[in-house]
């Protein structure tokens, strides 16, 4: 039976670790923060220190990023609401990245909680 995008996200969530905002804030001090939204979304505002590799290019570009050459690096992934992040986390796990976690609720939850937002560009491979 064919699956919808929501079905794919729900299935991905059964195989990944999702963390809440408090856990994300605690982990941000030692983990790489990866924004998988589109560049225009990233430019409008992103979590402090995040790098941007859009979801559609992630599997092709992640190995080129110097901070992501070690597959045991802690990586926190987010998107707008956490659907794309869940799919990205699953694929990175399949590629051998072992410290991958998705931030539940994504950037929308972050900004609604009035947490800090940056607008400085840190896109990779743009």
Language-model-derived ranges and their functions:
Residues 1-32, 39-74, 83-126:
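Rhodanese-like catalytic fold shared by cysteine-dependent sulfurtransferases
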Residues 78:
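Short, surface-exposed ligand- or partner-binding patches at beta-edge/loop junctions that are enriched
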